[in-house]
From Swiss-Prot:
It comes from Conus pennaceus. Belongs to the conotoxin O1 superfamily. This is Conotoxin PnMKLT1-1111. Residues 23-50 form a propeptide. Coiled coil: none annotated. It is found in: Secreted. One of its GO terms (cellular component) is extracellular region. Residues 1-22 form the signal peptide.
Length: 76
């Protein structure tokens, strides 16, 4: 019984701590995501969803943009 009560108190404390230490303006992040999504709906060229991966021997900046996921200044 004591262990159950201690667990309940611990969960309530951790929940309250999470709420108190949360970023105060996190709702602005959601608003920015909404505006970005709306802009992408109006301007489909701005969307990252339709962008395809790069083929071999194309200049790249990150491995996830290459079809092979290997980037050494060019897609391998």
């Amino acid at each position: 019984m004591k262990l159950t009560c201690m667990m309940i108190v611990a969960v309530l404390f951790l929940t309250a701590w999470t709420v108190v230490t949360a970023v105060p303006h996190s709702n602005k992040r959601l608003a920015n995501l909404y505006l970005k999504a709306r802009h992408e709906m109006k301007n489909p060229e701005a969307s990252n969803v339709d962008k395809r991966c790069f083929e071999s021997w194309v200049a790249c900046e990150s491995p996830k943009r290459c079809c092979s996921h290997v980037c050494l200044f060019v897609c391998a």
